[in-house]
Amino acid sequence: MAKKSLIHREKKRQKLEQKYHLIRRSSKKEISKVPSLSDKWKIHGKLQSSPRNSAPTRLHRRCFSTGRPRANYRDFGLSGHILREMVHACLLPGATRSSW
């Protein structure tokens, strides 16, 4: 189980990313449209002044049940060992173990 503080920090990053999403996207479009380098630097400075945690690359996918940040399956939102336990217990409908 992940620490509550780490899960809370991740939720805070998600809120910041949603808040600054439109601002970051519009300023990136402006950079591509502006021909002069000095104007690009000004817009880039505006991007740099936004909070560091508002960048989408700072987000991690976490396991829904344990909060584990590694080995997550996007389709289920679970980490590998929890996914395996749930499939063995038949708690995930439609998931089957492969055998050949």
Curated annotation (Swiss-Prot):
Function: Binds 16S rRNA, required for the assembly of 30S particles.
PROSITE patterns noted in UniProt: RIBOSOMAL_S14
Record GO biological process: translation
GO molecular function: rRNA binding; structural constituent of ribosome
UniProt source species: Carica papaya
InterPro entries with a match to the protein in the record: Ribosomal_uS14 (IPR001209), Ribosomal_uS14_bac/plastid (IPR023036), Ribosomal_uS14_CS (IPR018271)
Protein's cellular compartments: Plastid, Chloroplast
Subunit structure as annotated in this protein's UniProt entry: Part of the 30S ribosomal subunit.
Name this protein carries in UniProt: Small ribosomal subunit protein uS14c
Gene: rps14
Gene Ontology cellular-component terms listed: chloroplast; small ribosomal subunit
Pfam families registered for this protein in UniProt: Ribosomal_S14
Family: Belongs to the universal ribosomal protein uS14 family.
Keywords: Chloroplast, Plastid, Ribonucleoprotein, Ribosomal protein, RNA-binding, rRNA-binding
